[in-house]
From Swiss-Prot:
GO BP term, pick one: translation
Gene3D superfamilies according to UniProt: 3.30.1320.10
Family (UniProt): Belongs to the bacterial ribosomal protein bS16 family.
Species this chain originates from: Pseudoalteromonas translucida (strain TAC 125)
A Pfam entry, by short name: Ribosomal_S16
Stated name of the protein: Small ribosomal subunit protein bS16
GO cellular component: cytoplasm; small ribosomal subunit
SUPFAM superfamilies in UniProt: Ribosomal protein S16
GO molecular function per UniProt: structural constituent of ribosome
Lineage: superkingdom: Bacteria
Keyword Ribonucleoprotein appears in the UniProt entry: yes
Record key words, sorted: Ribonucleoprotein, Ribosomal protein
């Protein structure tokens, strides 16, 4: 099953997440199909906290992809901000 979820990057104690479309059988930080954005939970000042390619997310959801709980909340927030 294809899912849209977070892929962790960054340094210890300083997380940075890529938002990726991946098969649910692949490991969290492993192979993915497409990168559709990023999420920086510790952004400060004028730094961009989230960037999301909403048309691609809509495309994948239309193809049957499911959203992880956290990504669903991020998509909702991104739609509200747009």
């Amino acid at each position: 099953m294809v899912t849209i979820r977070l892929q962790r990057g960054g340094a210890k104690k300083r997380p940075f997440y890529q938002i990726v479309v991946a098969d649910s059988r692949f490991s969290r930080d492993g192979r993915f199909i497409e990168k559709v954005g990023f999420f920086n939970p510790i952004a400060a000042g004028q730094e961009e906290k989230i960037r999301l390619d909403l048309p691609r997310v809509e495309h994948w959801v239309g193809q049957g992809a499911s959203l992880s709980d956290r990504v669903a909340k991020l998509v909702k927030d991104a739609r509200k901000a747009a």
